[in-house]
A protein has these predicted regions:
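...captures the hydrophobic TM-helix bundle architecture rather than a specific catalytic motif
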Residues: 1-180
Length: 180
C-alpha cells in the first residue's frame, strides 16, 4: 500500500513517492549542426521561424517602398506595368502568407503552445522541424522567382480569377510561388 496516498515508484526500503521524482534534464546538443539544423526543440524552431519571417518581412518592406516610390514619382524607377504588378503580387504574398502566418503560427505558436498546455515540447517534434525546413525552402523559391526570366507571378496577391488566369498574367507562372 502507498504511504500518504502516494504510489511507490521503487519497492523496497528506498521507496520514493511518485510526486517527488525529479524531472530529468533533456539532452542538449553542443554542435551548431545538431543544435540548429536537426533540432527538434519547439523553442529553437520558434526562433528559426521568427528570424526567417522577419528576414522575408524586410524584403516585403523594401518592396512596399518601391511600390510607394513608383506611385509617388512615376518613372523614377524604370519599371513597366507588368513588373509593377508582379511587385505588388509578391509584396502581398510575402507580407500576408510568409511573414504574418509564419511569425504568428510558426514563431509564437511553437513558443507559446507548449507553455500554455504545460508540456515540454510539441507532440510531433520531427514533423515540426520538417515543417520549418519546408517553409524555408518555399521562402527561397519565392525569392528566387525574382531572378528567373519573366520574373515572379503577377496574379495579384489574392490569386483570384480573372487575374490568376495564366494566359493574361505576366510572369513565369504560378508554380514558382510554392505556397506551402
Amino acid at each position: 500500500m502507498a504511504a500518504n496516498g502516494y504510489e511507490d515508484v521503487v519497492k523496497g526500503d528506498d521507496a520514493v513517492p511518485a510526486l517527488e521524482v525529479q524531472p530529468q534534464e533533456l539532452y542538449h546538443a553542443k554542435s551548431f549542426w545538431t543544435r540548429y539544423i536537426f533540432c527538434q526543440d519547439a523553442k529553437v524552431i520558434a526562433v528559426q521561424y521568427s528570424l526567417t519571417a522577419i528576414a522575408i518581412g524586410l524584403v516585403g518592406l523594401v518592396s512596399s517602398w518601391l511600390i510607394r516610390m513608383q506611385i509617388a514619382y512615376p518613372g523614377v524607377i524604370p519599371m513597366d506595368a507588368s513588373a509593377y504588378y508582379q511587385l505588388v503580387t509578391m509584396h502581398g504574398m510575402i507580407m500576408v502568407i510568409y511573414l504574418l502566418t509564419a511569425l504568428f503560427l510558426g514563431g509564437f505558436g511553437n513558443y507559446l503552445i507548449p507553455l500554455m498546455v504545460g508540456a515540454r515540447d510539441m507532440v510531433f517534434p520531427y514533423v515540426n522541424m520538417l515543417s520549418y525546413w519546408v517553409f524555408l525552402l518555399a521562402v527561397l523559391i519565392l525569392i528566387s522567382s525574382y531572378f528567373v526570366p519573366g520574373g515572379p507571378t503577377g496574379a495579384g496577391w489574392t490569386l483570384y480569377p480573372p487575374q490568376a488566369i495564366t494566359s493574361g498574367t505576366p510572369g513565369s507562372g504560378l508554380g514558382i510561388t510554392l505556397m506551402i
